[in-house]
Amino acid sequence: MTTKLIAGNWKLNGSLAKNAALIDELRRAEMHCVVCVPYPYLAQAQALVAGSLIELGAQDVSEYEQGAYTGEVSAAMLVEFGCRYVIVGHSERRALFGDSDQVVGRKAASALAAGLTPIVCVGETLAERELGEVEAVIRRQLQAVADCVGGEALPTLVVAYEPVWAIGTGRSATPEQVAQTHGFIRAWFSARCDASAVRILYGGSVKPENAAVLFSTDDVDGGLIGGASLVGSDFVAICRAA
């Protein structure tokens, strides 16, 4: 398996001053990581990460290439600002902004067409877990993406398993739960492509205190980090735990 991938999702946070301080801390620590910053800060971040081990990502992308789509940002635009990765299907986009499985699939296809690597987020709610629907939910989410990107593109995806009930709650899934679900995701890909090439990240209340255990769990190839990615010392500690 390839080197573990650690991506920070800044969400709706940051300022010019805070961004500069945070990226400077990551540069000084010589961290190899991805930072997914809000759109307005992409130009600043592109300049700040130049010549470092830090790679740039965005938090969402339009399914459309261009045209009369007010407020949208295309994959080609992200590439011009140095992005290599883009998150698609984050649970907050699905729940708050109505991104359906099909929209997520089209966004992933749009990203791939422009040369971006999509970080495809999948995961279940607490109610779905309690009903025993974890695998059914993730199977549906993955299949919608596969239908849009095609089988040949599957090995190029990054998948982030984010149990919705563990995001921003301080409650992380147990290593056993993570191993079981990541194993299911790996098996799903194995039936369709070379699954060894697919990086499967865990996202959901990853902290310096639990990162090493989570990252040593079977089929965990890194993490998609939310709140802890905004604190330089915490994010550095998480990256080093990988």
Swiss-Prot record:
Pathway: Carbohydrate biosynthesis; gluconeogenesis; Carbohydrate degradation; glycolysis; D-glyceraldehyde 3-phosphate from glycerone phosphate: step 1/1. It is found in: Cytoplasm. Substrate binds at residues 9-11, 168, 205, 226-227. It catalyses: D-glyceraldehyde 3-phosphate = dihydroxyacetone phosphate. It is an enzyme of class 5 (isomerase). GO terms for molecular function: triose-phosphate isomerase activity. InterPro entries: Aldolase_TIM, TIM_sf, TrioseP_Isoase_bac/euk, Triosephosphate_isomerase, Triosephosphate_isomerase_AS. It comes from the Bacteria. One of its GO terms (cellular component) is cytosol. Its EC number is 5.3.1.1. Keywords: Cytoplasm, Gluconeogenesis, Glycolysis, Isomerase. GO terms for biological process: gluconeogenesis; glyceraldehyde-3-phosphate biosynthetic process; glycerol catabolic process; glycolytic process. The active site is at 90 (electrophile), 162 (proton acceptor). It holds the Pfam family TIM. Homodimer. Belongs to the triosephosphate isomerase family. Involved in the gluconeogenesis. Catalyzes stereospecifically the conversion of dihydroxyacetone phosphate (DHAP) to D-glyceraldehyde-3-phosphate (G3P). PANTHER family: TRIOSEPHOSPHATE ISOMERASE. This is Triosephosphate isomerase. It comes from Azoarcus sp. (strain BH72). The lineage of its organism: Bacteria, Pseudomonadati, Pseudomonadota, Betaproteobacteria, Rhodocyclales. The gene is tpiA.
